[in-house]
């Protein structure tokens, strides 16, 4: 079965359709609709529909996006795409697309991919960092993604740090 992956970022959505061997059949990039949630849903739905019309065969849909998916509610939280926060994106897309949608944090997707078949495949512990419109991280140990009870394990981009003290930390 073909697989459609969407990498949702603060400024762009990149879509790639892969065949059974992992070869890219089509790649497309569009601006991220980030002003209204309804526009975001329409943009993603239109993109997936374009692929359906062109390839005329079923494919799975997987989405990596900034922010966490609450294990309790399934709603997006902590996203730098503010219109997504509090929304049940998976349910909304599944209803519009009439098919299952896999949804995960983008940094978690990156870290797991590198740990399984990328630069970290020989390592026991892999930390993946994303630097873009926002920043985030994912941690994989023994090929297993760590997400934690709040689905934010590995996230480092929005942590409060203590202030710099020259007498304690030295001069730079």
Question: What is each stretch, according to the model?
Answer:
Residues 38, 42-45, 49, 57-61, ...:
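Glycine-rich phosphate-binding loop and adjoining helix at the ATP-binding site
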Residues 3-65:
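Conserved phosphate-binding loops in N-terminal lobes of ATP-dependent enzymes
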Residues 11, 66-69, 132-134:
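Short glycine-rich anion-binding loops that position phosphate/pyrophosphate groups of nucleotides
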Residues 14, 71-73, 137:
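Glycine/Thr-rich phosphate-binding loops of Rossmann-like dinucleotide-binding domains
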Residues 14, 68, 109, 155-158:
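Residue-level recognition of specific faces of alpha-helices
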Residues 9, 21, 72-73, 142:
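Residue-level recognition of short loop/turn positions
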Residues 2-4, 16-18, 27, 36-37, ...:
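Glycine/GP-enriched mid-protein hinge/lid loop-to-helix segment characteristic of carbohydrate kinases
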